[in-house]
Amino acid sequence: MTHTSSSNPRLDESRTIIAPTGTALTAKSWLTEAPLRMLMNNLHPDVAEHPHALVVYGGIGRAARNWQCYDKIVEVLTRLEDDETLLVQSGKPVGVFKTHTNAPRVLIANSNIVPHWANWEHFNELDKQGLMMYGQMTAGSWIYIGSQGIVQGTYETFVAMARQHFDGKAAGRWVLTGGLGGMGGAQPLAATMAGFSMLAVECDESRIDYRLRTGYVDRKATTLDEALAIIEESKQSGTPVSVGLLGNAADVYADIVQRGIVPDITTDQTSAHDPLNGYLPQGWSMEQAAEMRLKDEPAVVIAAKKSMAIQVQAMLDLQKSGSATVDYGNNIRQMALEEGVANAFDFPGFVPAYIRPLFCEGIGPFRWAALSGDPEDIYKTDQKVKELIPDNPHLHNWLDMARERIQFQGLPARICWVGLKDRARLGKAFNEMVKNGELKAPIVIGRDHLDSGSVASPNRETEGMMDGSDAVSDWPLLNALLNTASGATWVSLHHGGGVGMGFSQHSGMVIVCDGTDDAAERVGRVLHNDPATGVMRHADAGYDIAINCAKEQNLDLPMLSEPK
């Protein structure tokens, strides 16, 4: 049954989706209840950016293709048996097949297009015809947990930047950025947690207001003078503050250059990966952009990319003036390059500059959510992480700050960057906590697709690989296949997340800890094998940290000792 209230099958203003909580099952087991709740959680009004349109985050990253498909997915998950697998093709449930109890209950493929046709123009045509949807990374794979999902990764990046550029001292320094959407909205909180102040430019006032309500932004400004005065005050006091400035990023960045002001760090997290839907051209209102998207898509794209070129040129100018400038993975450099900014890639991406050593040890954005809906279940797992990893004060500090400063969105959840050495141990411990009743209901464990072995993205995660293998996308395919073989509860394989059509392929997995012995076996396999593929991928590329980690963890990599 469908409830759509307009001629657009993707829009239904009457819908409010909130996942069930507690121990009563809607589906036949926790293995199907879990994907059902996490799908619904992606569309919770406190989680999704535009839930009535099925948009979770990242421009047009959706949880389901349309409301009819959403309803059918829910219906199938409630009747799915524990030896059946649902196949989802770009947000549409297309088949249920008999498999076995250790197979995934759901297999998802989103936004995948044969490479020659893998561009926004062809995707948008398919999208209009109702043949495809954009899954982003965790939108269409049902494991988005709100802005917390990227806070720690952003925090780790800012900490690394403080260490690399400022001798570890962030006090009195500030960051210029753009974008306060589902991903970018994590930046202000991550910056202040790391000791920096931040000026974040956002063209949608409702996003600034939402980040204020949820504690991600401290102050709001409507003029650059007002925002800079707040930043100057924080520099003098040494107390970090974040400011959301209502404005256009291209305008503001160029104005800052014109004034001769140099931020300590410059970056950007606008949705530049999608010039049609994600970036507001200079001089345009939000209403004008929405209208033009319906009337003249090419004109919107042209205007957006011209504005991106102006913003990137300003970032290059700030870099020359001494600002530590970094691309935060939205492909804005590529867009500017296509508009004639020949040296757009003169500033690095954040992964090769600051994150890759972590990836070499399989360390990445491990996350879990409490299906009970009770925050106490998360606090208990926080404590378990501290018990099992007692000698990592940086991690303990993160968990303490997260509890104090991060508001849960939808189901209570936690993000925690750990790697190959720890993920399986933690997962099995969580499963045991469910088994013995310490936790009120099962836990789901997943991750971002932005992880060490699950993505090929030459302008982001795999930029500048030392062996030149940036564009080799066999690795995320192998990761998805191995997670399927290992018994993950649901596995996803996507294209275009983060950086847009034609620029990335990536995979995700989620595993349910339901307290059973079978779950313990599956958790052990999946949470070892998944990060191990990241160590394998980086060892194969020749990174010493990864090679040493592979040897320490006794990974069987047949070509490791052979010359390249």
From Swiss-Prot:
Binds 1 NAD(+) per subunit. Its EC number is 4.2.1.49. Keywords: Cytoplasm, Histidine metabolism, Lyase, NAD. Pathway: Amino-acid degradation; L-histidine degradation into L-glutamate; N-formimidoyl-L-glutamate from L-histidine: step 2/3. The keyword Cytoplasm applies. Its main location: cytoplasm. The active site is at C416. GO terms for biological process: L-histidine catabolic process to glutamate and formamide; L-histidine catabolic process to glutamate and formate. GO terms for cellular component: cytoplasm. It catalyses: 4-imidazolone-5-propanoate = trans-urocanate + H2O. GO terms for molecular function: urocanate hydratase activity. It holds the Pfam family Urocanase_N. Gene3D superfamilies: Urocanase like domains, Urocanase superfamily. It is found in: Cytoplasm. It is an enzyme of class 4 (lyase). Its cofactor is NAD(+). Catalyzes the conversion of urocanate to 4-imidazolone-5-propionate. This is Urocanate hydratase.
